Amino acid sequence: MSFPKRLYQKIVSSSWQLGFIRDGLEGVLSDGFFSVNWVKSPYKDRWFADPFILDVTEDNIYLLVEEFRYKYPKGRIAKLTIDRQSFEIIDLKIILEEDTHLSFPNILRRDGKIYVYPENANGGKLNLYEYDEANEKLVFVQTICDDVIWDSCITELFGKKQMFTAHR
């Protein structure tokens, strides 16, 4: 990647930052104002976006996120461990990398298993992966959709499974 393009990416991309609303949804809905605990990242060569909560313990918050390094301009899916007191990232593991850009690692929990279906619009399809907790990686299960779609959300509505997505 050329220097001007890298510089542009760094300037534009550096504005992404993860945060947690302190007052929860009730505080936001009651008065419309909220304060944020911003996640402190030790990484200056990348940013994180599209957070989905994998787990919360007494000490830590575990997120699946899009990780984007300036040096390699494509997203990867990472698992972040965040300290609940300091809101500092204390661990980072890449759990899925493809040849194309990945983002929006939406989580689906079914029958005691955790599935993830990250956006892969550049790859032209939406794949389903099972989260292998022991090895901290995503294992391919099947292709959900052979089309270019963005930010998909699978849910149950009116007694039926539904998928909401964006298409260009």
Model-derived features: positions:
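Beta-rich carbohydrate-recognition and catalytic domains
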Residues: M1-A49, L54-L102, L108-R168
